[in-house]
Amino acid sequence: PNAIALTEYQAKIFFGNEDPIGKTFSAKYTYENETITYEVAAVIKEYPQSFLKFNALAGTTSQFNGGPTLLLVNDLFNIDTFTQKLKDDKVPTFNGTGQYYFYTLQESYFQEQTYTQEYIPYIHRNQKDLLYVGLFSAILILVIACFNYANLSFSRILQQVRMIYTQKVMGASAGQIHRQLFLDTFLTVLIAFFLSLLLTLDFLPAFNQIVSGRISLGFFFSGQVLPVIVALILALSIIPSLYMSHKINSLSHSEYKSFTTGTRKRTIISGLSILQFAISIALVFATLTVRQQLTLTQTNGERYRDLIEIADWSGNHIQTFSEEIRRYPSIEEMCLSRSGIIQFNLRTMVLKDENGNELNYTLGQYEGDSTFLKVMKINILQGLSEREALKQYSTPVYINEQYARLLVPKGENPVGKPVRLYDTEFGKMEKEGEPIAIIAGIVENLYTGTLRQEVYPSLTYLTHTPPYNLVQVRLKKEHRAEALTLLQQTWEKINPNVPFEYQDIYEEFMLSNRKTIELAHLLIMYSIISLLLTAFGLFGMALYAIQQRTKEIGIRKVNGATAGEILYLLNRRFIGWVGIAFAIAVPITWYSLSCWLENFVYRVDISIGTCLLSGGIVLMVTLLTVSRHSYKAASRNPVNALQSE
């Protein structure tokens, strides 16, 4: 029963390069107040793509209180039949009213991180919508790259056609021309693939961090991915070369020029460019809006910046510990409490709407000393100060805005009235002879979780008598490392049998909003890539377009055209493309963002300013890219231009 298997990583931490088999170590379980000595029986190989996340595997102890169970089933397994069988056999459940939930590993992987009985804490999970957004954005980036390639191919096709026609005159067969076109395209794609591998090697750690992934470079050469990459390389090589070979071989000499410089080519290039600009505008627009939602999240979490929470559930040492650390200059302020900030006390509250239908709410309850509100930076909107409340009432309670909105009749002042006047369930819990809880004031809402959920109605009790279980400490930013070292040293001196642990409240709050953070970072990454690809494509297109119009520019300058007029002539087509792309991208992106923002109870509004800024950014990148070539052409001596023609 005391045998344990360690992962390679954990075994190296415990025993270094020594053979860990047969060695022992002790683990102290704080909550059970129990110490168990384990003997290492095996070392497990690391599997980065495993759905399980663990450092050790051990048998259950006598104090095991249940939890998720993994079932290995065959192909004939039917979940509905199995569920009904459990009901028919009356398999015991919690209090006789519980229920068994069944999920496949795929469903568990994409399950929301909510701490319910059916939530499995020890498996890796990811966000389905984040993966879809990432996949869709990657496809859009690939489309931009393909459009770039198509546009640049069209831009240099005249030179290719002249060369191929010369080869045909010299006796080259259709097969030889096709092989040459394929080889040219294939080498371009292959070189691009190897360059992409180098970029992937550099950016993969950042990508894994953004999406909480565990992808290694070897994954791209696995049986899952390598066939897809090979198929993509071949498709990008064969399809363009086949099209060009067929088209060129079917054209007569008189049709070459109209094919390469005619209206049809201009229409294709214009269409591809407009779609490319539309994708870039959409990604930038989405990025700016998601970034605003992330800023709203960060603003609500600022009150937790440099705030840590230290717990002692035995309650024997927290008072002594707090008195000792209070004198440290690296600590800004601190308070004692009986409940955590992120993981606080909860109870169910049932209310009725106008039609008599029952509405279930979760009520949060905090208990802290007289400095609790100050340390948490919670403003009192109405009522008494903490000091006055503790003087006037034995059990002062502050309700938050959400509580007042749900339970206090509109226009009524609840300050000075018993809590049980508004919350009947609360009244049932109050014991006879104990002081009555009186509402001392209304405080602003405290956001402790994701902005996708409505803030909990809450009660905050103030007390100046022990016992306390936690201390919340706000550190001075410039002395954070020093403060943490002092806190650990003090803890180990006062409570040597319990490891020093703390919870960073800001990190925990941002972790609960991880979906928004990862989406924002992912979109920022894709937006930058799309703008870079667009700029690269424009650079080549502008260079070719100006080369084609060298004679025209020279004649216009001889006839008195100014540099500004030449710049406008060369740039107006690109400006028009951006304008059309803006008109296409904005309605679609606006609608998509509106649907996404509906997932948030507290959200930003999509603004016209953000919309215009996204178009302005793409237009600026376009003009900066194109204008370099345009300015050189506009400022060139027309005599030299005409001589070269």
Q: Could you describe each region identified by the protein language model?
A:
Residues D89-A138, Q159, S173-A174, F203-A231, ...:
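Membrane-helix entry/capping segments
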Residues I120-I123, S153-R179, L183-F186, L190, ...:
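Alpha-helical transmembrane segments of integral membrane proteins
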Residues V225-M244, I529, A535, T610-K632:
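Hydrophobic alpha-helical transmembrane segments of polytopic membrane proteins
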Residues N497-A583, L593-W596, S635:
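C-terminal transmembrane helical bundles of large multi-pass transporters
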Residues A145-F186, G537-I575, R636-N637:
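Interfacial "coupling" helices/loops that link adjacent transmembrane helices in transporter permeases
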Residues L187-L204, N208, I529, G576-L593:
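Hydrophobic alpha-helical transmembrane segments that constitute the membrane-spanning cores
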Residues N126-R162, V189-L190, F194-L195, T267-R291, ...:
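Hydrophobic alpha-helical transmembrane segments of multi-pass inner-membrane transport and secretion
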Residues N2-N126, E323-L511:
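Mid-to-C-terminal secondary-structure elements
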